[in-house]
Structure formats: structure tokens, C-alpha cells
Design a protein with these regions (language model features):
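Short amphipathic alpha-helix that is part of the acyltransferase structural core
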Residues: 1-42
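Charged/polar, solvent-exposed surface patches and flexible loops
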Residues: 22, 26-29, 33, 46-50, ...
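Generic structural motif
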Residues: 18, 71-73, 86, 135-139
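Acyl-donor binding region in acyl/amide transferases
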Residues: 76-124
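Intrinsically disordered, low-complexity boundary segments flanking structured domains
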Residues: 1, 46, 67-71
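Active-site rim helix/loop that mediates acceptor-substrate recognition in acyltransferases
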Residues: 35-56
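Conserved donor-binding loop and adjoining core beta-sheet/short helix segment
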Residues: 51-89
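Active-site/acyl-donor-binding loops of N-acyltransferases
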Residues: 2, 113-116, 120-139
Length: 139
């Protein structure tokens, strides 16, 4: 599995390189809130670096923020909604425009890594797997 380079067409780049940091900072709370549910896989600095380098895309909204990444699997390319924080209604509505953007990038599907509640909100998504984690640091 590799991450597709979307630096030439990502929403982050459309902000302009000088605006990425400012927009990220404006949305830091939404991103930090979403990271609380990520199992400690990334720091907020990791997310900023991924957005700044084009590995992930920053989708700033009025009352929310979504972070996506385009992932090439061997048989298809997906746009993964990696982090989402803020107003639930706005996030659900924004998914539609992100899906349009993803299709324009050659994505075959959308994918969401998130809490179980997203399944109730996004009726056109199908649960295809369950992610289980076990913390080995204290064993």
C-alpha cells in the first residue's frame, strides 16, 4: 500500500503554500480533537507535516476540518478520510464534495477510519472491516 502523490491538485495546495500553516493553525482544535480518538498513532505535528508535504489533504470548513489521504492499494485507489473534527452536520455534508474531489483524482472509492458512530451518519457507506488494537507498552 502506497500513498498517492496529490501535491499538484490537493485542496491543501489550492490554499497556497503560505496559507497552509495559517489554515492548519486555525483548525488545530478540530484536528487535535479528532486525534484524541486515533489511538496515539500520530501527533498534531505529524498531521501538519503530512498536509504541508502533500501526503495528506487539509479540508478546512467553517466549523470543522477534515484530513484526507489518497491511498493506492494494489487493486484500487481510495480517498481515506483520516481525521474529522468539528460540527457533525457540516462534516457529513462536506463528505459529498470531498467524494467529488476524490473521483477527480482518480479514486475508485472512499474509506473512513473512525468511530462506529460514522456508520449511522453515512448510510451510503458499508462497514467492511473492524480495527482492533491492543496496547503492548504496559505488558
Amino acid at each position: 500500500m502506497t500513498t498517492k502523490d496529490t501535491t499538484q491538485t490537493s485542496p491543501t495546495l489550492l490554499l497556497g503554500k503560505d496559507r497552509i500553516k495559517a489554515k492548519f493553525e486555525e483548525n488545530r482544535k478540530f484536528i487535535a480533537d479528532a486525534l484524541e480518538y486515533s489511538g496515539g498513532t500520530h501527533s498534531i505535528e505529524d498531521v501538519y507535516l503530512a498536509c504541508a508535504t502533500g501526503e495528506a489533504q487539509l479540508h478546512p470548513l467553517e466549523k470543522s476540518c477534515i484530513i484526507t489521504e489518497v491511498v493506492d492499494y494494489p487493486s484500487l485507489t481510495v480517498c481515506r478520510i483520516w481525521l474529522a473534527g468539528g460540527d457533525l452536520d457540516e462534516l457529513v455534508e462536506a463528505e459529498k464534495s470531498i467524494a467529488v474531489w476524490a473521483k477527480s483524482q482518480g479514486c475508485d472509492a472512499m474509506e473512513i477510519n473512525g468511530r462506529k458512530g460514522w456508520q449511522r451518519q453515512l448510510k451510503d457507506y458499508t462497514a467492511t472491516s473492524v480495527v482492533l488494537t491492543k496496547d503492548l507498552r504496559n505488558e
